[in-house]
């Protein structure tokens, strides 16, 4: 009887140990899954924060000049009469410096939109009398107001070059322009100071009127 009781006790303890081991394994698996979920959430948050880049001050002006080039740019988007009541004009400084900035947003604040080949061909074929005289007077007002604010930035070109191009402009669209600029700088740097003639000077034949001074 005692042996049977001992055998039953050992068998019960063995089953208890098995159940405890399985419970521990389940707990370990659940904790590892939680750690993986937390790590994935952190990585997604870091990627979102990194993608939402902000530009302020001189970096914002450099980015606008690099994107818009000769077209010029505005700090506040020109609003129409229909959209002035519905939406508030926040401005590029508030959007890029305090929220997030991307290339599409910078393109919206350029003064003149980039015309495609279809638009250029369509405007060249259309003949509109007396309209060019009106269009020529409008941009002059914007140019006088626009470029008078940036004379200080144009004088400090060395500081803009030291800061470099922001990371948001390292897209595929603007890499070709950077390569062209570098090629032009290298061509100007490696230009020879003295250009040697390609042809040798003509050799004169020896003359018979040679006088020896010995």
Curated annotation (Swiss-Prot):
What protein name applies here? Insulin-like growth factor 2
Q: List the disulfide bonds.
A: 56-97, 68-110, 96-101
Q: Does the keyword Signal apply?
A: yes
What does this protein do, in the record's words? The insulin-like growth factors, isolated from plasma, are structurally and functionally related to insulin but have a much higher growth-promoting activity. Acts as a ligand for integrin which is required for IGF2 signaling.
Which Pfam families does the record match to this protein?
IGF2_C (PF08365), Insulin (PF00049)
Extract the CDD domains matched here: IlGF
Assigned keywords, A-Z = Disulfide bond, Growth factor, Secreted, Signal
A GO molecular function assigned to this protein is: protein serine/threonine kinase activator activity
Q: Which Gene3D superfamilies match?
A: Insulin-like
Identify the InterPro entries for this entry.
IGF2 (IPR022334), IGF2_C (IPR013576), Insulin-like (IPR016179), Insulin-like_growth_factor (IPR022350), Insulin-like_sf (IPR036438), Insulin_CS (IPR022353), Insulin_family (IPR022352)
Spans annotated as D: 112-117
Q: What are the start and end residues of every segment in region (B)? A: 48-79
At which residues is there a site annotated Important for interaction with integrin?
71, 81, 86
- Highest taxon of the lineage: Eukaryota
Q: Which residues are removed as the propeptide when the protein matures?
A: 118-214
Taking the first listed entry, what is the main subcellular location of this protein, grouped into a coarse class? secreted
Q: Which is a GO BP term held by this UniProt record?
A: positive regulation of MAPK cascade
């Amino acid at each position: 009887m005692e042996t049977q009781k001992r055998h039953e006790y050992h068998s019960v303890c063995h089953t208890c140990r098995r159940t405890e081991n399985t419970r521990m394994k389940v707990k370990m698996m659940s904790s590892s899954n939680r750690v993986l979920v937390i790590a994935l959430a952190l990585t997604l948050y870091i990627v979102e924060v990194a993608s939402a880049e902000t530009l302020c001050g001189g970096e914002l002006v450099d980015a606008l000049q690099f994107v818009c080039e000769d077209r010029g740019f505005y700090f506040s988007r020109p609003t129409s009469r229909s959209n002035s009541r519905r939406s508030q004009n926040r401005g590029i400084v508030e959007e890029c410096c305090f929220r997030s900035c991307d290339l599409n947003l910078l393109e919206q604040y350029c003064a003149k939109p980039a015309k495609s080949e279809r638009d250029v061909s369509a405007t060249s074929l259309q003949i509109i009398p007396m309209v060019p005289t009106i269009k020529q007077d409008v941009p002059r007002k914007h140019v006088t107001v626009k470029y008078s604010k940036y004379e200080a930035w144009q004088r400090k070109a060395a500081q803009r070059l030291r800061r470099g191009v922001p990371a948001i402009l390292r897209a595929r669209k603007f890499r070709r322009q950077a390569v062209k600029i570098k090629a032009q700088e290298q061509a100007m740097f490696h230009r020879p100071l003295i250009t040697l003639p390609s042809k040798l000077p003509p050799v004169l034949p020896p003359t018979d009127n040679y006088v020896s001074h010995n």
